[in-house]
Each structure stands twice: as C-alpha cells, then as structure tokens.
Amino acid sequence: METEQIRDEDVLKWILGQRFRAAQKKKAIEIRKKMISAEHDGVDEPAGIKAMVEEMNARMKRQQARVDQAILRVMDIIEYLPEDSLEKEICEYRHIDMMSWRQIEIAVPMSRSQCNNRYNEAIRMLLQNARVREIAREEREKYEEYIQQKSEAKKWRKKMAEKKFGK
C-alpha cells in the first residue's frame, strides 16, 4: 500500500475521532467548572468568580456545538458505507456511540482483531468514495498540525521526566 493511501487512512481516522476529542474537551471544561464552583460553594461569590463561571458556561456551549457538529460530520461520512454492513455498524459503535473496542467486541460479537480488520476495511471502503477522499485531503493540513503538537508535547514530557529523574 502506498504512503499516500496510509496517510489518507490516518487522516480519515482522525476526522472520525473528532466527536470523541470534542466530547473529551467538553468534559474537561465541565470538571473545571465543578471544581471552581465547589471551591466557592456557600461563599458570596466575587464578581470575578461569577464572570469566570459565566465564561466557562459559554465555553461549554461552544464546545457542545463542536460536539454536535462533529457528530453530524461523522454520520455524514459513515453514511457512505453499505447500509447493513458490519463495517458500518462497527464505525457507528466506535465513532458515534464512542464505544471502547472491548464493548464493540461484545456487541458485534467478534474478536478484537476481527473487529479491527473490519474497521480498517471500512476505512478503505470509505476512501474509495471521491467525496470522502476530498474531505480527507482538505483536512490533511489540520491533521499534520495535530500530529506536530502531539509530537512536541511528547518531547516536552520526556524532557520533564528526564529532569525529574536526573538523567
């Protein structure tokens, strides 16, 4: 398989994972808001705290809009798979229902490797569609930025670990 095809597959998997990442960010904002609210519970809240809570509420609404948009985008892409196919079912479980691979194995029922093979086949099937290929190519730059950020974060964590343990 050529490198370009592998990259398209990686980009498509990243696009399909947008719902999960958006939901995780929303969850993180909710946790921060709860922590701040708990710290100031029962205390007359200064204007600064109220403003911060209002800002967090606004961020949660924006993040929910991103989650909703990601769900629609994922559903639109998955629609290109054959209607009653196992590949479509696995993609829906993974990217719409956000099920773990263990949960998918049980729901289908198949082994993890069989589920993964079917999932990878679904990705290849999707990339046979011109519109899906176009979407993947349009998002490639954002995907590359995402990978670059992950790489930089990994290097930073490694550097901090080396400092901590005096290597």
Regions found by a protein language model. Give the residues of each.
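Short alpha-helical segment immediately N-terminal to, or the first helix within
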Residues: E92-R94
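N-terminal interaction/assembly modules
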Residues: M1-Y80, R124, Q128-K167
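Short, solvent-exposed positions on alpha-helices
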Residues: K88-E89, S113
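Helix-turn-helix DNA-binding module
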Residues: D97-Q114
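Short helix-coil-helix linker/hinge
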Residues: Y80-K88
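DNA-recognition helix of helix-turn-helix
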Residues: P109-V132
